[in-house]
Amino acid sequence: MKNRPTAFSFLFLSFLLSATVLHAQDWQLKRDKGGIKVYVRDQAGTNIKEMKFSTTVEAPLQTIAAVLTHVEGYDDWVYASLKSRTIKQVSDTEAYYYTLIDFPWPFENRDLVLHSKIWQDKKTLALHSKTTSAHWMEGEKESVVRIKKAELYWLFTPIGNGKVRVDYTLNSDPGGNIPAWMINLAADQGPLQTMLKFQEMLEKEKYKNSKLAFVTNEK
């Protein structure tokens, strides 16, 4: 019995050390295009890279939140999105939705069922949006590969003078028989185009005039 706490402590310490090493993995700059910096880093247990996209925009937080929460508008700016629809609107800040993604030949199209939450830090006014897979909520479709691993995180940090720093982190696996090296080679193209189109959406009148109760603009 006396040995059990020691063994448990060793395992727990090993876990903490492993987590610390993973957390300390630095982002590496892959490219800088159109004012958007693209970073990559290794992930534990897979050869597929995690990606982060960073830029600065000039837009009210209300406008940013309006674009992010309008699921039916995703086809206008999310790269290769063929059809996006809300499955369940839990609240103004939480939803489940479906997205069908166009994949290049010879690969089959992909789809995702996702759970998204958005919230604001009342002290810093930073806006957070986290989206994770909810692939079990809707049946899979014929000739379409369901993406079951997906985690997207947006962070919008006000930096003064009406400007906002944008950090978009993406961790996913498209599934199917696509080699990891091929995924890593082209994986940043879609999200990069998404970021560019997202900035265009911020200029649309239907979003610029939005008033959302759960978001406070920077003064």
Model-assigned labels for residue ranges:
Residues 1-7:
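Positively charged n-region of N-terminal signal peptides that target proteins for export
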Residues 9-19:
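Bacterial N-terminal signal peptides
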Residues 20-24:
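Sec/Tat signal peptide C-region and signal peptidase I cleavage site
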Residues 25-219:
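Eukaryotic helix-grip
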